[in-house]
Amino acid sequence: MTPQAFYLALEQAGFALTNHQKEQFDTYFKLLVDWNRKINLTAITEENEVYLKHFYDSVAPLLQGYIPNEPLRLLDIGAGAGFPSIPMKIMFPKLDVTIIDSLNKRIHFLQLLAKELGLEGVHFYHGRAEDFGQDKQFRGQFDLVTARAVARMQILSELTIPFLKIKGKLIALKAQAADQELEEAKKALQLLFAKVLDHQPYQLPNGDGRYITLVEKKKETPNKYPRKAGIPNKKPL
């Protein structure tokens, strides 16, 4: 997917980018490739692949209408090189974006990226979701939580739901095993007082299959969740 094809696809979906936004995506791509030589950010570095599998895939929830262009607080867990939240922020500048990532080198890259792109209302924290999820500054504070290729739904739900306000929503971007993951996560979602609102398949422009899973928080998360770092992964709910 060339940059031009990416812009055209967004325009056809009703999201015409400004020249400034196009320049931001171009700068993002160049910085990603440059920094990937220093630290391992992604295995995907060819321009057409980045625009398809990183940029387009990241903004799919916007194209599908899951996120409005409003000043909502969005938390991205394990964003790595900034996906999906930074492409979302470029498209919807009103979003207030927080990223938590366990690798400090990636946080350093994201800080530099935000500065180079001129992004405001972006915040970066180094650490584990399990620890931040028990911190009052973060727990129950977000309208939206996004996660892309972080963990299976059974684990991911415990790492993300505690951050949401009541009626806040988790938007999980998943590959083809999503149906099986949801079945495995039923108990975890019940324990966390969360409910699946939507679970939709979609295709990237090249035909690759993906899923968007939308989960709503119904009540306050029990205090014992998330459990200590590492436990959700070793002993899923």
From Swiss-Prot:
Keywords: Cytoplasm, Methyltransferase, rRNA processing, S-adenosyl-L-methionine, Transferase
Binding-site list for S-adenosyl-L-methionine: 78, 83, 129-130, 148
Pfam families: GidB (PF02527)
Job of this protein: Specifically methylates the N7 position of a guanine in 16S rRNA.
Protein name as annotated: Ribosomal RNA small subunit methyltransferase G
InterPro entries for this protein: rRNA_ssu_MeTfrase_G, SAM-dependent_MTases_sf
Subcellular location: Cytoplasm
EC number(s) from the headed UniProt entry: 2.1.1.-
Family: Belongs to the methyltransferase superfamily. RNA methyltransferase RsmG family.
Native source organism of the sequence: Streptococcus equi subsp. zooepidemicus (strain MGCS10565)
Alphabetical list of Gene3D superfamilies matching this protein: Vaccinia Virus protein VP39 (3.40.50.150)
Disulfide bonds: none
Keyword check for Hydrolase: no
Domain of life: Bacteria
